[in-house]
Amino acid sequence: MVKIRLKRMGSKFRPVYKIVVADARAPRDGKFIEALGHYNPSNKDFVLDSEKTAKWLANGAKPTVTVWNLFKNNKLTESLKAKK
């Protein structure tokens, strides 16, 4: 199963996350298929390639709960559902 999830990056106590498409069995910070964007929780910076995300959702990738909540908080769920 393919998931859209967060990959932790950054330094200790200052996380920055990449939003990636990865195999569900791969480690959290391991190999991924494609990067879709990034999220910085300290300054709430959120960047996402919505076309790539819509393509992966249409192909059956499942977002994790945390990623789906990020989509909802940034009001992207309706636009992503419409592009499906």
UniProtKB/Swiss-Prot annotation:
InterPro entries: Ribosomal_bS16 (IPR000307), Ribosomal_bS16_dom_sf (IPR023803)
Keywords: Ribonucleoprotein, Ribosomal protein
Gene3D superfamilies: 3.30.1320.10
Superkingdom in the source lineage: Bacteria
UniProt keyword Glycosyltransferase present: no
Statement: the UniProt record of this protein carries the keyword Thylakoid: no
GO cellular component: cytoplasm; small ribosomal subunit
Gene Ontology molecular function, alphabetical: structural constituent of ribosome
Family the entry assigns: Belongs to the bacterial ribosomal protein bS16 family.
Name of protein: Small ribosomal subunit protein bS16
Species in which this protein is naturally found: Mycoplasmopsis synoviae (strain 53) (Mycoplasma synoviae)
